Amino acid sequence: MATTGNWQSTSCILCSVNCGLQVQVEDGHFKKIKGDKTNPGSKGYTCEKPASLDRYQNHADRITSPLRRREDGSFESIDWDTAIREISGKLAHIRDTHGGSKILYYGGGGQGNHLGGAYSAATRRALEMRYSSNALAQEKTGEFWVERQMFQARPEPDFEHAEVSVFVGKNPWQSHGFERARVVLKAIAKDPNRGMIVMDPRRTETADLADVFLQVKPGTDAFVLAA
């Protein structure tokens, strides 16, 4: 990629909030990364994760080709055609011997582009798979179910204006929060007319800002909520 000093607008893909970013690219590397103040959602805010994007993309230890395990447990690099041929052959053998229902497809798109999940359709069809799953099955299905029971829809939480905010097993100060999470959390903590309740086995950065912190034992959160 040619050297450029111009700021380019884009968005972060490291969580579902997708904060707006501005980046400078030089010779295929991110030279500078900052929050995009013109983004109507994040308004220039970012957490620390985007600052590491160049390290993720260009780290010396990044795996750039398939690795095949040797008998001694070490790995050797192989080309993509070989990897696809060997893996597809083994999967086809499982299908022919035990049936496609014995193969579980797990995967999908990234946080910034979920179209990758659709690419699995041809593979699942060819292998006669019946079952599939992804990270949302663990992370979000319970949340979606509760929202449907309470609101008959999936509302977007308005923590910026809420009088009372409740976080159960969630630390938006660090990850997977909401737009301008740290700015909003600090504003809630400083406002005597607003409250924050955190329920978590671990005392997190968000818990340190809370008016009420319930440090429950793992597995007991449902009982606390029921009470």
Identify the role of each PLM range:
Residues 1-227:
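N-terminal export/assembly segments and adjacent metallocofactor-ligating motifs
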